[in-house]
Amino acid sequence: MTMDDTKATVLSILADLTGEDVSSNMDVNLFDEGILDSMGSVQLLLELQNQLGIEVPVSEFQRSEWDTPAKIVAKVENLQ
């Protein structure tokens, strides 16, 4: 999977979970803006696992490392 494919998949998951298209602002803080909450985080991790085979235990989820679309894409790319 290319970097563009990964980015598109992550943005699609975020859009499905939040109802928001965040592709135009990859640095928006999803938590501060109320776009994503703790339940959404768990759903995000489950969808990343289902769609991309990325496993991130909830216990290892550091909110500050996953708070923008750009950070999420970078984390996923590092874990692939």
Curated annotation (Swiss-Prot):
Keyword annotations from UniProtKB, A to Z: Cell wall biogenesis/degradation, Cytoplasm, Phosphopantetheine, Phosphoprotein
Superkingdom as given in the UniProt entry: Bacteria
Localization, UniProt: Cytoplasm
Main location: cytoplasm
PTM summary: 4'-phosphopantetheine is transferred from CoA to a specific serine of apo-DCP.
Pathway(s) served: Cell wall biogenesis; lipoteichoic acid biosynthesis
GO BP of this protein: cell wall organization; lipoteichoic acid biosynthetic process
The Carrier domain, residue ranges: 1-80
GO molecular function: D-alanyl carrier activity
InterPro entries (UniProt xref): ACP-like_sf, DltC, PP-bd_ACP
Cellular-component GO terms for this entry: cytoplasm
Residues recorded with modification O-(pantetheine 4'-phosphoryl)serine: 38
Similarity annotation: Belongs to the DltC family.
Task performed by this protein: Carrier protein involved in the D-alanylation of lipoteichoic acid (LTA). The loading of thioester-linked D-alanine onto DltC is catalyzed by D-alanine--D-alanyl carrier protein ligase DltA. The DltC-carried D-alanyl group is further transferred to cell membrane phosphatidylglycerol (PG) by forming an ester bond, probably catalyzed by DltD. D-alanylation of LTA plays an important role in modulating the properties of the cell wall in Gram-positive bacteria, influencing the net charge of the cell wall.
Official protein name in the record: D-alanyl carrier protein 1
Origin species: Lactiplantibacillus plantarum (strain ATCC BAA-793 / NCIMB 8826 / WCFS1) (Lactobacillus plantarum)
